[in-house]
Amino acid sequence: MGCRLLCCAVLCLLGAVPIDTEVTQTPKHLVMGMTNKKSLKCEQHMGHRAMYWYKQKAKKPPELMFVYSYEKLSINESVPSRFSPECPNSSLLNLHLHALQPEDSALYLCASSQ
């Protein structure tokens, strides 16, 4: 088999969070091939008006990917189109993934703020 068939992007999500957290991210771990389509869900229950998705590669600081604030979605222009956000309401910010590349292997983090 060719290298492309064996290649997969490993997406690790923050798993060490306090039990009483009001921001949840699911699934906590995700391994997917380059042709799969998956979604990451970020949900907050604090009434915050802003939500964020970050990408953090090994030994690098987090990079802001998307912001949903006051019912407006802002997209970092450097984020490839294989990542697409969806905000069905002010407490959810989903991240849809498709056709990932090996360089997409990273820690994906969601957050919220007032």
From Swiss-Prot:
What role does this protein play?
V region of the variable domain of T cell receptor (TR) beta chain that participates in the antigen recognition. Alpha-beta T cell receptors are antigen specific receptors which are essential to the immune response and are present on the cell surface of T lymphocytes. Recognize peptide-major histocompatibility (MH) (pMH) complexes that are displayed by antigen presenting cells (APC), a prerequisite for efficient T cell adaptive immunity against pathogens.
Q: What is this protein called?
A: T cell receptor beta variable 4-1
The cysteines joined by S-S bonds are 42-110
**Gene name tied to this protein:** TRBV4-1
The biological processes this protein is annotated with in GO are: adaptive immune response; cell surface receptor signaling pathway
Q: Which organism is it from?
A: Homo sapiens
Q: What GO cellular component entries does it have?
A: plasma membrane; T cell receptor complex
**Could you confirm whether the keyword Signal appears in this record?**
yes
Task: Spell out the Pfam families in the cross-references.
Answer: V-set (PF07686)
Keyword Signal among record annotations: yes
Can you tell which superkingdom this protein's organism belongs to?
A: Eukaryota
